[in-house]
Structures are given as structure tokens and as C-alpha cells.
Amino acid sequence: MVHVPTRGDVPVRLGPSIDNVPDHGPSKMSRNPYTDPIQFELERERVLNRSWILGGRSEQVSDTGDWLTVESHGETVVVVRQPDGSLSAFHNVCQHRGPAIVTEQTGCGAKRFTCPYHGWKYDLTGRVVAVPERMDFDPEHLAGLRSPEVAVDEWGGWVWVNLLGPDDAPSLASWIGDDIMTDLGQFRMEDMVLHDVLEWDVPVSYKAVVDGFNEIYHTAELHGVSPDWVKAARDTSFWMVNERNYMCFVPRHDQLDELAENWDHHRHAICHYVVFPNTVFNCNPEHIQVFHPIPIDVDRTRFLCWQIVYPGDRNDPEYARYFDKMEKHWAGLKRVVGEDISIYEQLARTKRSSAYREHILSSRECKLAHYHDTMARMIAD
């Protein structure tokens, strides 16, 4: 039987009694967050290096010695499953002369890792365990040497890393927040499996990609959604969870009657969760997309879209119906994301234009304003 997410004991998040737009108001903001290389360097140092960053699915590192690499904003990290079932993570940087220790994105059953340049060997926790012609080095330089540790944790079937390291990083639970962990947890992502991954190289800031998933104002023009959907979307509820994260719930226009009888947002709405700085969960009862724009440079982004589904036997009629519905919906969503990509290409044409100075935001683009205010506060700290 396919899992059907329901609200359960989670508080009502959507309905006529819910104040659906936070008191942020219309605003303006500079274009600098998208185009200024100095600000990007500050973000790397003060935001991205201190945040929990999505790395991949736990199922990619299910057995001892399985590993994946996490690449983001000029950093590269190796995550490895340990013999005791835990995960370790360390910078993917050879401590000899700097090349990447691991050259592939994923792998299985490693016993140790060998730098391809001079053959230095590392154990599964990142410690140097063998150095060719060791007698030619100062013993003090090699004593206890390791690639620096990175904090790593799992939640919802996802692997997360934090470059502050195990001693200094906040807990992943505190970063995501109880409200999102409880609400998003109703979907039981840890029981889902990877169905598809799409990847694009887009010539804009990763923040422009996040923005596209933080408002529904654009959907009528860009995606050509129906007037009924636009009307229903006016009842979207927005929830600022903490100083960083937020969630919103968009009524599904084809289930408005069901929703009016039972304000169960997990069953009758699109549930949308943003974990700062660059992870977006877009949840439907049938499947979940995770949008992950990875910053490469101030105006270049590696954009990943993960699709996860509930597992089952496709020979089972009930699961076959579920899978067919999911596949059709996924095909439509891929078209929608392609339309978003077309806008990023147009933004790339104008990002250096003298006529591009600022953004004018409506009250319903409050999540954009909140997101960039959060970024500015973290840079200032």
C-alpha cells in the first residue's frame, strides 16, 4: 500500500482562519546580491561555509565504504559510510599539495582513498595512513595529519554537511527547525527512493534560482496556469518558521471541495518548504521534488532537481496507478522547470545592463524579501 501523507496531529496551516501573508509589505532591493562578486565572497565565507548544505541521498551511501562527494561554492567534501553505520565527512583536499583526493562523484565499498597525484593514502575518516617515501619528510609535518573534518548528519533520507566542522556547527535539527521537521516529516522522505535527477548549468546567481521557488506571482504568465489555479493560489498560506526558514501551502485547485471539508494541507495542497540557504522541498502527495541550486560563482549555478517517490511493485495494480499518476505529474513539472530555465537565460542577458538597478517587490513576494534580509544579516555578523 502506497503511503498517503496526512496532516495528523500537525497544526492547521491552511484555511479561512489563517492569516496567509506575513506582515512584510511591499519593498525594494538592490540588484547587488545577484551580481556583486565581493558580496558573493562574503556569502561564501559567512553564509555558505556556516550553513547546513544538502549533499545527497542516504541511499547513495548505504553500506560501509560507500561514498559521495559534495561540491559547492568552491568547496569539495567526501562523505563516507563507516563500519559502525555512521557517516564521516572531510575536505576532499590532499594535504600534500592540494589536489582532490577523490575524483568521482560516488562510489561503493572503498577501503581507503588514494590521491592520484603522489599516492598519499587516507582512511575512511580522512586521516593520512600512508605516504610514499615517507623518510624524506619531516616527521612532525606528518604526525596526526588528516584532511580537515566536516560536520555531517542525516535527516529525511538526506545527507547534509556543514563546513564549520563537528565541534562548531549547530545541530542539523536546530538549523531546520521543529516546525519544518514535523510538518515535512509527514511525507516520510526516509522511506522514499530516488526516481530521477535533472541537472542544468545556469548563468545566474543561485539566489535567482531560489527566488523562482519563493513566489507564485509568475505562474500565470510564465507557466500559463488556469485562472482557477491563480484564484486558488491567492489563498496560499506563508509561514516564517525561524529567522532563516519558511514554508507555504498552495491549495490544489482540483481539490478545493475536499480541502474545504478537511483542511489537510498534506493531502489537498502543494506543500513547499525552504531550508536556508539553498534547499527547496516541493511536496505533492504522490512525490517530492527537491530543488538544489549549487553556487559555482557569483553568476553561475549548478542546478539540481531531485525526484523521490514511494517504492513499490509496479505489477501491483494500486502501485501501478500511483506510479502512472506520478510519472505524468513529473513530466509536467519538468516542463515547468524548463520554463524557469528560460527565464534564467533572459536574466543572464540583462545582469550587467545599466538599466537593471533594483527589484520592486509586492507584499506577496514576501519570502524573497525575507530570504535576502536573512542573507544580509548573516553577512553582517
Regions found by a protein language model. Give the residues of each.
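Rieske [2Fe-2S] iron-sulfur-binding domain
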Residues: 60-165, 169-179
